[in-house]
Curated annotation (Swiss-Prot):
This is Putative L,D-transpeptidase in ATP synthase subunits region ORF 5. It comes from the Bacteria. The keyword NAD does not apply. Residues 1-35 form the signal peptide. It comes from Fuscovulum blasticum (Rhodobacter blasticus).
Length: 189
């Protein structure tokens, strides 16, 4: 009986020591191995509006595809908000540069792009609702087929998962939708 208790005590002490060592080990930094990180990563790098736009007067958005975050500044530059996003799945699908919001739609319909139809000929347009890939709100950019929109599939946020669009949680696109009028300046980097 004493041997059994001693073995159990030794095992408990060993497990406690291992747990303590694990807690004392520092976590790996996000930049330790960026090539191996595949899921839900966002560095939320800080940006200043002056680094992207010459003047104030209209709200501004910077979609940072590297850190997978969308930065918003109001027309005065004082209100800065950061939203986690999904970004295009590849650099080939990522259009970078300056554009603006040209149209907004609450409860948007989705239509596959020509390139999506070539890859997936059975895909059909989807009206508003829980199956719609654009989520609850969409802000259309001056570039054809590029949209800042919501998503019902929250697993996509923080990942490279779109065919060119910038996706946000539905709650966050609803907030941004109210802040950004047509004419809001947008830069995708």
């Amino acid at each position: 009986m004493t041997d059994t208790l001693n073995r159990r005590a030794a095992m408990a002490l060993g497990l406690a020591s291992a747990a303590g060592a694990a807690l004392a080990t520092p976590a790996l930094s996000q930049d330790a191995a960026p090539a191996t990180v595949r899921n839900n990563v966002s560095g939320f790098q800080m940006h200043a509006w002056r680094d992207h736009f010459d003047s104030l007067g209209k709200p501004m958005l910077v979609a940072d595809t590297f850190s997978r975050a969308l930065h918003y500044w109001n027309a005065e530059g004082g209100d800065h908000r950061i939203f986690p996003t999904s970004v295009p799945i590849s650099d080939d699908l990522t259009k970078r540069g300056y554009t603006e919001i040209v149209r907004k739609k609450e409860g948007p319909s989705w239509t596959p792009t020509p390139s999506q139809m070539a890859r997936y000929p059975d895909w059909k347009p989807i009206g508003p609702g829980p199956d719609n890939p654009l989520g609850t709100h969409a802000m259309y950019l001056s570039w054809p087929a590029y949209i800042i929109h919501g998503t019902h599939d929250t697993r996509k946020i923080g990942r490279r998962s779109s065919d060119g669009c910038i996706g946000l949680y539905n709650e966050m696109i609803a907030e941004l939708f109210q802040l950004c009028p047509v004419g809001t300046r947008v830069r995708v980097i």
